[in-house]
Amino acid sequence: MEVSPFYEKQIECIHCKKHFPTFKVRSKNIRVMSTASDFQPVYSDTQVHAYFYNVLVCEHCGFSFTEDFTKYFAPGTTELISAQITSKWVNHTFNGERSAEKALEAYKLAYLCAVLKKEKHIVIAGLLLRLTWLYRELKNEAQEKRFMKMALDQYMESFSNEDYARTQMSDERVMYLIAELSRRLEDYQTATRFFSRVIERQRNTLEPKIIDMAKEQWEILRETRNQTAQQ
């Protein structure tokens, strides 16, 4: 009998402390074929998108979060979430397989909860980047660009106050994303500046792959700017 790529896991809500079930993808079924220049994974099995399941939606109170959220709630935020989310929540579950549309709904809930909870800019940026990927999956270019710009703004804020310290995000990775999202949004000046800053670190980095990606995108950017200048 074929084993499902999904398994059910019990999660404790960090807001209401109740437990709820959610689907997760078995690690052996996560097969990334390639990665886009903004880190969107391309899976060999198009039916199994692991990042669709990153958001945990509490069926009891509606609070939606990822493993990147802290368990700390700043004073007043618990009450704000109860008023803005829980009081309007109609009990329903996000357990089960998720389509791109269902994942989009979950990520939008998580984004709202992150803003109300006053999560770090780096966490909010990650949610917005994945919303960008989802709209790309759905071939909605206008919304893809909209959320890309929102993600870029949050990465800029995070870089300015270094709130990504002690996370899995390095200086190089944050600067690279600022550069690449700027390039995609045709802000070539910002893209040039930040790609340069990443490449400058090539002799003293723990992220050689990011340096290589920055060089590749720098070349694409240079060609684009040359073509634009010739028009």
Residue ranges and their predicted role:
Residues 1-80:
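N-terminal cysteine/histidine-rich coordination modules
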